[in-house]
């Protein structure tokens, strides 16, 4: 397997531990790629979720083991690197909070942006389930009440 691809999550590991382990694995893979590229790298889609300990959608037409690199415009898109898939997300330019620093040169799209990115790759049911997972993850990591996180998600949707 390519050294920059994520490993599949173990099926018998408790979810919180497996999310933590998957995030650490993702950070290592993403940091190695950023070092190889020699600069900051923004990750989106399922990679952004993995980096931030958000459960991945069960039914998604993207390969969750690939590293999904995101840029703001097509001309800024990274060249194709084995084990990666480049994407463009134009909202980066207009939403200053779209990029979340993870470690060193590794950045991830905010979970709301990753959710919106994934909207064309999952069913409506999966999108609702993913929104709930994101609300829970943000609530747990920030200490904010889930209703406040939901309100922030609604505001994001209204302003996107």
Question: How should each PLM-predicted stretch be described?
Answer:
Residues 1-160:
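Short gly/ser-rich loop at a beta-strand->alpha-helix junction or flexible surface loop bordering the NTP-binding
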């Amino acid at each position: 397997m390519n050294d920059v691809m994520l490993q599949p999550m173990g099926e018998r590991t408790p979810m919180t531990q497996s999310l933590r382990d998957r995030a650490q694995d993702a950070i290592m893979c993403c940091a190695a790629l950023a070092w190889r590229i020699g600069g900051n790298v923004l990750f989106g889609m399922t990679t952004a979720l993995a980096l931030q300990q958000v459960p991945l959608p069960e039914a998604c037409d993207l390969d969750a083991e690939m590293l999904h690199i995101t840029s703001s415009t097509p001309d800024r898109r990274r060249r194709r690197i084995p084990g990666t898939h480049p994407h463009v997300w134009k909202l980066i330019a207009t939403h200053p909070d779209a990029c979340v620093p993870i470690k060193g040169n590794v950045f991830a799209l905010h979970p709301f942006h990753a959710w919106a990115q994934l909207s064309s790759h999952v069913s409506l049911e999966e999108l609702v389930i993913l929104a709930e997972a994101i609300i829970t993850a943000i609530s747990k990591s920030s200490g904010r009440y889930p209703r406040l996180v939901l309100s922030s998600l609604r505001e994001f949707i209204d302003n996107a």
